Amino acid sequence: MVTLAELLVLLAALLATVSGYFVSIDAHAEECFFERVTSGTKMGLIFEVAEGGFLDIDVEITGPDNKGIYKGDRESSGKYTFAAHMDGTYKFCFSNRMSTMTPKIVMFTIDIGEAPKGQDMETEAHQNKLEEMINELAVAMTAVKHEQEYMEVRERIHRAINDNTNSRVVLWSFFEALVLVAMTLGQIYYLKRFFEVRRVV
């Protein structure tokens, strides 16, 4: 029987394998991150461009044998999951080389799943049902955490767009008010001159 303390330690270990980061990538620059895993381990990359330019970035995932696993150009956000095809270090790169002057801020998470169990370990059919439920709960909690982080990023982006639009509307309204006042003063001056009696001496 598994005790509550063991379950909490297992849950903490499962949640510890997920890390969310913000990274700033300058124009004409590339940032790479590395994860060493064993063959068969499930990995995932979730990313979203939070700030900068057209909110796009180039993404590339490369295996230990320099084999391209995933390549995406000018993506704003994405989610990619795969199983490691061999033991070694996997490379996750974000490139801002297409940008001429705007740095980008990228929020990303690299998920590393459990390593596959060997022949000497007990099979899935004999696993404890409670352990399976905890694994499912950990995965669900991680997914909720990711969604909350990405919703915060999206909310920040939309708030910036709303603030920008609001300031433009206020400036345009102020400009229209000035034009209206100028036209009113011009019409008053014109009508006053129209009804003026000119005396000839």
Swiss-Prot record:
A motif (COPI vesicle coat-binding) lies at residues 194-201. It is a single-pass type I membrane protein. It is found in: Cytoplasmic vesicle membrane; Cytoplasmic vesicle, COPI-coated vesicle membrane; Golgi apparatus, cis-Golgi network membrane; Golgi apparatus, Golgi stack membrane. Residues 1-20 form the signal peptide. PROSITE patterns: GOLD. One of its GO terms (biological process) is endoplasmic reticulum membrane organization. A motif (COPII vesicle coat-binding) lies at residues 194-195. InterPro entries: Emp24-like (IPR015720), GOLD_dom (IPR009038), GOLD_dom_sf (IPR036598). Residues 21-168 are lumenal. Residues 1-181 are annotated as: Interaction with F2RL1. Its main location: membrane. Residues 190-201 are cytoplasmic. Residues 117-167 form a coiled coil. SMART domains: EMP24_GP25L. The keyword Transmembrane applies. One of its GO terms (molecular function) is smoothened binding. GO terms for cellular component: COPI-coated vesicle; COPI-coated vesicle membrane; COPII-coated ER to Golgi transport vesicle; endoplasmic reticulum; endoplasmic reticulum membrane; endoplasmic reticulum-Golgi intermediate compartment; endoplasmic reticulum-Golgi intermediate compartment membrane; ER to Golgi transport vesicle membrane. Belongs to the EMP24/GP25L family. PANTHER family: TRANSMEMBRANE EMP24 DOMAIN-CONTAINING PROTEIN. Ectopic expression of TMED2 alone does not result in its proper cis-Golgi network localization. Coexpression of TMED10 is necessary, and coexpression of TMED3 and/or TMED9 is facilitating localization. Down-regulation of TMED10 expression reduces TMED2 protein level. Monomer and homodimer in the endoplasmic reticulum, endoplasmic reticulum-Golgi intermediate compartment and Golgi. Probably oligomerizes with other members of the EMP24/GP25L family such as TMED7, TMED9 and TMED10. Interacts (via GOLD domain) with TMED10 (via GOLD domain). Associates with the COPI vesicle coat (coatomer); TMED10:TMED2 heterotetramers are proposed to be involved in coatomer association. Interacts (via C-terminus) with COPG1; the interaction involves dimeric TMED2. Interacts with SEC23A; indicative for an association of TMED2 with the COPII vesicle coat. This is Transmembrane emp24 domain-containing protein 2. It comes from Homo sapiens. The gene is TMED2.
